[in-house]
Amino acid sequence: MLRFVVRSVLLMTVVMACRLADAQIDTVAADPVGAAPGFKAVSEKELNAAAGRLRESLGPLRQLLDRSKSGAGWREYLDWKELERQAASGTKADVETLVRLYRKFDSGENGLEMPQFSAVKRAVGSYLEAAGTAGNPDAEKVYKGRLERLAAAVKEAAASGTPQSLEVVGPTLARLEESGQAPQVVARLRKALGMPNLLLQVDEDLVGRSVNRVVDETAPINEMLLGARVCGTGHTTGLVLLDFQPSADRAVVDLVLTATNHSQTRGTKGPVTVHTLGTATVDARKRVFIDEKAVTSAPVDVNASVATKTQGISVNKKLGAKLIRKIASKKIAQMQPQARAISEQRARQRVRSQFESQTAEPIRKAASDYQTKFRQKLLERGWFPEMLSINSDADRIFVTARKSLPDQVAAFTTAPEVAPAAVLSARLHQSFFNNLAEQELAGRTLTKEELESQMEKAGRKMPESLESEADQPPWSITFAKRKPVELAVSDGTVKLTVRGSRYTSGDREFDAMDVWATYKVESDAGKFRLVRDGDVQIYPPDFVPGGDRKLSVQQTSLRGILQKRFNKVFDEVIDIKPLELPGELKSAGPLPMEQLVARKDGWIVAGWRQAEAPKSETASLAAVEP
């Protein structure tokens, strides 16, 4: 059960609800670069540091190539020996050689999107920028131009309230940082334009509906107490409840047992049998911690109290029975505090042992899954957020994340509020999606066969919209290096663009083409849907429909092929169905959508309300007897 709690939290995931950074674009709009310092020549120390970062980045890639069957081929392709020579060059880097090496990493060959390759690519680029700036007589002019572009882009974004003009900001900040220029300006703008771009929250009520249980069990009692054999029955009633705890630096989840055991026993020692009514109350708590690194737990904490009432004393002996009963009654009164203390201690030990045994394996499994299925998997693919914070209050668990590499920006405004009735919500800024898409797809070639293989590994079927028809040959797409797949959010609309720098259909090759569709967010009688605004648009990059420029015969042919396929990919109407929940959470769903908001600053907010309450279930727990 506890494993379910932890997994549920992770599935909905991982946040500081809403203790967001104070910085946002309004704080820098009036004077984006401030009193920027003058140009500073790149020092030997900075060149050596850039070379050191390149050497450091080679380690993980070297390990990857050592264990890869294609490692030798990659080393030859990347000119590994020259790469190592340049990494050891310090202040004597060869700019032309670094340019050549960088182009190899930026060629779009499949596999180069892996994080080990990407890290070296960034390190080569950083070293190249530092060395190029050091040897460029026009470096000061370039520096001033960058500051001007930054100021113009930030002012435009602040004035329009949209992120479109910020496209140049991420790469420009990265180049300034790599060449050691204007560190205060870089830090200031990174803070303003690097706010969290993914916020998730889940209510205790939602998870609790699949966790909370009624305890109702009758069990036999048979034990020794102060030399007497005690037998009888105990009836335990109570609740097992999920209880979120306030915590600023991690999520804290308690699984709490609150129960009362009413027992009726007879204790026999020699000729005397004592009939007793007992009441034991128990409060047990198993605490689990979840942060960005691991799932851990504390030992079970148990409180127990016992009260007894002697119902009667019988003596299995006629001779002297009255005297024996009198002595026994006095002895019982004297021993009652000791008996109560022993009973309370046994109750604590019993419940502690039981709770630990019930939760040990689920917690171990949850901790293992957190590492292997969440953290490690994201790290291996380079998807782990650059900032991830998990925390809780008395009612919710929050996950706050920011995904943005050094040459990318994130959100520049705070996220919209979540609807009060939402028990599960996700607030996604377009930068989260776009940054991840660029990291994963930029320059990559995807074939139908490769997509089929990936879908099969994931245990999914190929979407019909991406299947080649009987009369159509296999296809491939090479994604653009910049914004290969882009999400653009405006007030009440969502636009998705796919940019291909090259397409193939069988043996035929086609040049670059952009494909996009715009959807309106509509709601009616509490139901939400996305309605496509017109046809799917397919044009070459920078082509203006209705302008003087005309499509070539080849472009018209490709447009027809893509139109046929993408009209199936981008449905005219997408009805938002109630959300089916995974695993043990399934019984708490499906959740009807409560909120779907698209805002021009790039934010999408989706919230789901509680489903109708399921019938109560009963769980058993061994009786806690005095």
Kindly label every feature range from the protein language model:
Residues S8-A17:
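Bacterial N-terminal signal peptides
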Residues R19-A23:
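Sec/Tat signal peptide C-region and signal peptidase I cleavage site
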Residues I25-V211, K326-D533, P540-P626:
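Extended, low-charge, aliphatic-rich alpha-helical segments
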Residues V240-L242, P246-T296, S468, P473-W475, ...:
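N-terminal beta-strand/beta-hairpin edge segment
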Residues A298-I332:
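Short acidic, glycine/tyrosine-flanked loop/strand segments centered on an H-E-D-like triad
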Residues M1-V9:
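Bacterial N-terminal signal peptides that target proteins for export
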Residues A187-V252:
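Interfacial loop/beta elements and low-complexity acidic/Ser/Thr-rich segments
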